[in-house]
Curated annotation (Swiss-Prot):
GO CC field: extracellular region
Source organism: Lachesis muta rhombeata
Requisite cofactors: Ca(2+)
Domain of life: Eukaryota
Any one GO BP annotation for this protein: negative regulation of T cell proliferation
Designated name of the protein: Phospholipase A2
Enzyme class: hydrolase
Keyword Disulfide bond recorded: yes
Length: 60
């Protein structure tokens, strides 16, 4: 899912999503903890929650 999300970012933002956002904020990239730092980090948080619900996990 992370590679697909990176591809989406690349197409919409015209940035390499993997390189630019892999270590951005608290939720962009692998893992996630704490409070999202800004709107971009919140987007990654929402993506993680959505993906978690689809796969049966429920991140808070």
């Amino acid at each position: 899912h992370l590679l697909q999300f990176g591809d989406l970012i690349n197409k919409i933002a015209r940035r390499n999503g993997i390189l630019y956002y892999s270590f951005y904020g608290c939720y962009c990239g692998l893992g996630g903890r704490g409070r999202p730092q800004d709107a971009t980090d919140r987007c990654c948080f929402v993506h993680d929650c959505c993906y978690g619900k689809v796969t049966g996990c429920d991140p808070k």
